[in-house]
Amino acid sequence: MRNPQLNKHGELQHLLTIDGLPRSILTAILDTAAPFTEVAEREVKKLPLLRGKSIFNLFFENSTRTRTTFEIAAKRLSADVVNLNVSTSSAAKGESLLDTVDNLSAMQADMFVVRHAASGAPFLIAQHLFATGRDHIHVVNAGDGRHAHPTQGLLDMYTIRHFKRDFTNLTIAIVGDVLHSRVARSQIGALTTLGVPEVRVIGPKTLLPTDVERLGVRVFHDIREGLRGVDVVMMLRLQNERMNGALLPTPQEFYKVWGLTAEKLALAKPDAIVMHPGPMNRGVEIDSSVADGAQAVILPQVTFGIAVRMAVMSMLAGQQGSK
């Protein structure tokens, strides 16, 4: 079966999900991102790799970090960036997603960066472009429903590699609302592909998928037991906007039992790092003393996110787009 993310040469054509991508491609993205971190330290933070390319950010869900870092990344690569304001676009008047894509394609788009509440929306766009002979336009998934958030997963891998160097001797814990988290799915897929020997998932039963163990993770409902001896703690926020009346803990109950405090973090290795994809709910999934503490690498995640998104866009449109 054709992998819709790869072209006929096996090169990355779209980034829709981490699932199905070989370790070589994930490693290539991380390796490509490394020199881009240095661009931020320059007086002139510009490279000409995407000069003349038009990138459309189609965000049908709210976003701060993801949308902003995609825009910064594209501009640092010298691309022309168009941000679609969904609330004032024709989508608000009932225009279908694919009609929107068709019209923007007619404006000579080179790439769509898509965030959508519907799982599979970026796949639908990529398939439509292929079926209509416009698969030279690249699609990047910036988060689709509960399904996937591949660039977040990749920037998390870059952060781990930066601070821990080697994936193959780590124990990593993912804590919180895994059930509703597209980030967790991308994290688990990337960690497994990159050779992490033990991935732990920690949370209440009502916030974990019933089949989560088939992903090759160890499940813990006791956070203290789950954090014992880990190298990396990856926190997730409660996805209140995706919950539909399930038997769920209140924010106060969640914090008391599963919130990451300094006392709980002390059970991890002394040099463990703490990560969070944002936005953080302080006093719910993480205590401020931990979020602002010496072991937190939450702000470096944001910084590295720009470099990783530069890497993805340059690999898509900068190199292969001209073939």
Curated annotation (Swiss-Prot):
Keyword Transferase carried by entry: yes
Give the matching InterPro entries.
Asp/Orn_carbamoyltranf_P-bd, Asp/Orn_carbamoylTrfase, Asp/Orn_carbamoylTrfase_sf, Asp_carbamoyltransf, Asp_carbamoyltransf_Asp/Orn-bd
Gene Ontology biological process terms, A to Z: 'de novo' pyrimidine nucleobase biosynthetic process; 'de novo' UMP biosynthetic process; amino acid metabolic process
The positions annotated for binding L-aspartate are: 93, 182, 237
Quick one: which pathway?
Answer: Pyrimidine metabolism; UMP biosynthesis via de novo pathway; (S)-dihydroorotate from bicarbonate: step 2/3
One Gene Ontology cellular component annotation? cytosol
Which purpose does this protein serve, as stated in its record?
Catalyzes the condensation of carbamoyl phosphate and aspartate to form carbamoyl aspartate and inorganic phosphate, the committed step in the de novo pyrimidine nucleotide biosynthesis pathway.
Q: Which family does it belong to?
A: Belongs to the aspartate/ornithine carbamoyltransferase superfamily. ATCase family.
Name this protein carries in UniProt: Aspartate carbamoyltransferase catalytic subunit
Q: Which organism is it from?
A: Aromatoleum aromaticum (strain DSM 19018 / LMG 30748 / EbN1) (Azoarcus sp. (strain EbN1))
Question: What gene, per UniProt, encodes this protein?
Answer: pyrB
